[in-house]
Amino acid sequence: MTALTLLMILSAYLLGSISSAVVICRLWGLPDPRKEGSGNPGATNVYRVGGKIPALLTLWFDVLKGMVPVWGSYFLGIEPFFLGLIAVAACLGHIFPLYFHFRGGKAVATALGAMFPVAWEMALLLIATWLLVFRVSRVSSLAALVTVCLAPFYAYWIKPQYTVPVIMISLLILWRHQANILRLSSGEEKAFKRRR
């Protein structure tokens, strides 16, 4: 591993550590999403707390946190396996943000953003999977769980060189969804509702 690769891994973690949900809620004068709704600083909970525009901005910036470091590293000629580790670092930053007392989100959007520069076909397939499951179930967490469970198979099929990092990211996201899995198994997970 070169010094450049290490620098990009560190940069990805630091960029991932910027909690878009918390920053946008502060700018909009909204409550801290870690203390409201589901308690998760992600786009779905920001929608619950503040509506469509703050949620879309949160989603956009969470995607960029994964996309920017991987894209930059790709153009710097970093090898595929290490590009995967850079994606993992961005997700770790989102989950354990340095600047926000290590209280972060679930990294679904950040992981998706990390896929686009190196495997856009896979990223589109992941989006289609999430949308299909969400359309049927109206449960955001279930859509995320099904999508991340299928992600390693998609990677092996489309971009096998990224299979190991994708497995790592999928396991991280599954681990962050432990509470959701328990609520789903007990039938207590709430379906998504439009704000009025």
Swiss-Prot record:
InterPro entries (alphabetical): G3P_acylTferase_PlsY
Annotated pathway: Lipid metabolism; phospholipid metabolism
Subcellular location: Cell inner membrane
Group of enzyme by EC: transferase
Chemical reaction(s) catalysed: an acyl phosphate + sn-glycerol 3-phosphate = a 1-acyl-sn-glycero-3-phosphate + phosphate
UniProt record similarity statement: Belongs to the PlsY family.
HAMAP family reported in the protein's UniProt record: PlsY
Name listed for the protein in its UniProt record: Glycerol-3-phosphate acyltransferase
